């Protein structure tokens, strides 16, 4: 009876892990596709050659190293991605009617960002079923917020000029490439299904 119950538990665990793995891959694939579309739409928003605005360029100190996913759990990476996309969405939504921007392109860009946020929230929901919590994610989110605070301050100091926005759009493109990189690494995080099978088999064979 105990052995039967154990194998029943193993089958349930493997089935749920398989479903989770498939859902995760599907959502990450969708998020990756949407991110690529967002980059294309962002390029269409540029109304001024960046060469004209080089004197206004600024290093906003994108915290790529401190936000590297290798040192964090999957839940932390999801928190970073979610905060970055949320901040980008808020930045452009507040300036949707900016002179020189085609409103149609801006709206499409916001729709794509919103889709990414929905996919990430779905991922976070799946991950919540696997993890008890994501301690330390508040500090990571704070780093992202401080980075975007520097962008907001720059725009304000430059009176939201066309050149300032051109510089910021290039910076947001960097952000989206970073998001793309994080998404790629996210798909490689976590234990493979074969590792789970091996662990369960070892557990069954180990003497009590």
UniProtKB/Swiss-Prot annotation:
Organism encoding this protein: Homo sapiens (Human)
Tissue: Endometrium-specific.
Segments traversing the membrane: none
Family from the record: Belongs to the alpha/beta interferon family.
Stored Pfam families: Interferon
InterPro entries linked to this entry: 4_helix_cytokine-like_core, Interferon_alpha/beta/delta
SMART domains according to UniProt: IFabd
Species lineage: Eukaryota, Metazoa, Chordata, Craniata, Vertebrata
Record's function text: Type I interferon required for maintaining basal levels of IFN-regulated genes, including 2'-5'-oligoadenylate synthetase, IRF7 and ISG15, in the female reproductive tract. Directly mediates protection against viral and bacterial genital infections.
Induction of expression: By estrogens.
Keyword Membrane: no
Protein name in the entry: Interferon epsilon
Any one GO BP annotation for this protein: cellular response to virus
Localization of this protein: Secreted
GO molecular function terms noted in the UniProt entry: cytokine activity; type I interferon receptor binding
Major place of residence: secreted
Record's keyword annotation contains RNA-binding: no
Keywords attached to this entry: Antiviral defense, Cytokine, Disulfide bond, Glycoprotein, Secreted, Signal
Residue positions with a glycan: 95, 104
GO-annotated cellular components: extracellular space
Signal peptide residue numbers: 1-21
Disulfide bonds: 53-163
């Amino acid at each position: 009876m105990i052995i039967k119950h154990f194998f029943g538990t193993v089958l349930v665990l493997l089935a749920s892990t398989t479903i989770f793995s498939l859902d995760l891959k599907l959502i990450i694939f969708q998020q990756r596709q949407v991110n690529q579309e967002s980059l294309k739409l962002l390029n269409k928003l540029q109304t001024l050659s960046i060469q004209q605005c080089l004197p206004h360029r600024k290093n906003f100190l994108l915290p790529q190293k401190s936000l590297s996913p290798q040192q964090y759990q999957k839940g932390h990476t999801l928190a970073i991605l979610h905060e970055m996309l949320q901040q980008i969405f808020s930045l452009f939504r507040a300036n949707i009617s900016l002179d020189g921007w085609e409103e149609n392109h801006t709206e499409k860009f916001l729709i794509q960002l919103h889709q990414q946020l929905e996919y990430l929230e779905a991922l976070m929901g799946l991950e919540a079923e696997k993890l008890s919590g994501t301690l330390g994610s508040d500090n990571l989110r704070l780093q992202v917020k401080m980075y975007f605070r520097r962008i907001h301050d720059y725009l304000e100091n430059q009176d939201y000029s066309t050149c300032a926005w051109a510089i910021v759009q290039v910076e947001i493109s960097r952000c989206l490439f970073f998001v793309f990189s994080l998404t790629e690494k996210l798909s490689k995080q976590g234990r493979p299904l074969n590792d789970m099978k091996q662990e369960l088999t070892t557990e069954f064979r180990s003497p009590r």
